[in-house]
Amino acid sequence: MSTVESSKPKIINGSCGYVLEDVPHLSDYLPGLPTYPNPLQDNPAYSVVKQYFVDADDSVPQKIVVHKDGPRGIHFRRAGPRQKVYFESDEVHACIVTCGGLCPGLNTVIREIVSSLSYMYGVKRILGIDGGYRGFYAKNTVSLDSKVVNDIHKRGGTILGTSRGGHDTTKIVDSIQDRGINQVYIIGGDGTQRGASVIFEEIRRRGLKVAVIGIPKTIDNDIPVIDKSFGFDTAVEEAQRAINAAHVEAESIENGIGVVKLMGRYSGFIAMYATLASRDVDCCLIPESPFYLEGEGGLFEYIEKRLKESGHMVLVIAEGAGQDLMSKSMESMTLKDASGNKLLKDVGLWLSQSIKDHFNQKKMVMNLKYIDPTYMIRAVPSNASDNVYCTLLAQSAVHGAMAGYTGYISGLVNGRQTYIPFYRITEKQNHVVITDRMWARLLSSTNQPSFLGPKDVFDNKEKPMSALLDDGNCNGVVDVPPVTKEITK
């Protein structure tokens, strides 16, 4: 089988500064593939839908707030069913794998991929890969059909199991080839999608008719470009329960302080949105916003002020915040888990003890309650809005695979389903921009100090806006980065 060069970004330029960052297609390296009428044409459920099929030239802009004299900017291919497909129903042998940490909605995505393949396209052969990437070469599989997945969306976790690491490209693609699999659906975070990108490149190199599709998953909402990650709404909703409990504890005792640690290794979206939704939080600390404890304008001074004013206080901190302030023994900062993520110290316990020590030194009465709901938040079933979102992601992923697209993720951009090339979501992480309006809204809600000096403000103004926020699409057109092919095993 002849080898092919590594794929390059497919960039299509149009008038008025229009740029389409297209996704790969099987016909790019397998010319002459036959096409077939889309089975949805004969599906009674869609016979009443006018213009159900997506036009080949439809695209979705990355930014919707533009200047009248500015360029139209970057666009992505619109997701949805096409009139012609590149797989016959009996030809399809699909597989689904979940990797990385748990997230609300995993089972919903699995269910809807199976349902879409089965009910929309008449696919009969669908495999579940058990235990993450390792399952490909550990021969762990389970047959999936509509009966198996019927009610799994009501459960948390993933019925396929998951793991971190275990990525061996050659073994994985060998397994795909040996089993005759021609559609691979990979659900996972940025590390998982980097692995999916490498799998796609190897499949392309071998010249296999195999579509590789990613569905991005991260409870921290730190994947760029897309509006938000599935499971995020559920995580924020569940986080409020912990905040409410901390508030009840704090206001029920003299000088009560409730400290809640939420997920957010590098990005503080859960902490920020849970704080805004709760309205009971007096201080929110996230990785993007530096803070200090001692001295004028420090955290301790603010805590004392709040206790004097109201007699209680609720503090929310993301797990990645304050790592630079913790003990001088920073060995854990150099350790990583199997996915390559840094192992962080427990900032919640450290901050709680620091607050206790401060008040003991000043001989002030204080009662602190610490709540860590981390695994409660991510292990629950998805809520209604996330269930709908997961359905859209899964259906869009299946439509794209049947249409012959490959090497992409299914994601929401400005409220529209799109196909985004792998490199755009693995190049960097999404962060809260603390000079953005949403962070200003949080500060006005909690009345906490910004803890920012002039240098911090200047540095953060240089960062691009975050995608989830209302100002997040105002940044200009960015240069197209090279395809990333490295992966941490």
UniProtKB/Swiss-Prot annotation:
ATP binds at G101, R164, G165, G189, D190, G191, T192. Its cofactor is Mg(2+). The record marks G191 as: Important for substrate specificity. InterPro entries: ATP_PFK (IPR022953), PFKA (IPR050929), Phosphofructokinase_dom (IPR000023), PKF_sf (IPR035966), PyroP-dep_PFK_TP0108 (IPR012004). Pathway: Carbohydrate degradation; glycolysis; D-glyceraldehyde 3-phosphate and glycerone phosphate from D-glucose: step 3/4. Belongs to the phosphofructokinase type A (PFKA) family. PPi-dependent PFK group II subfamily. Atypical ATP-dependent clade 'X' sub-subfamily. This is ATP-dependent 6-phosphofructokinase 3. The gene is PFK3.
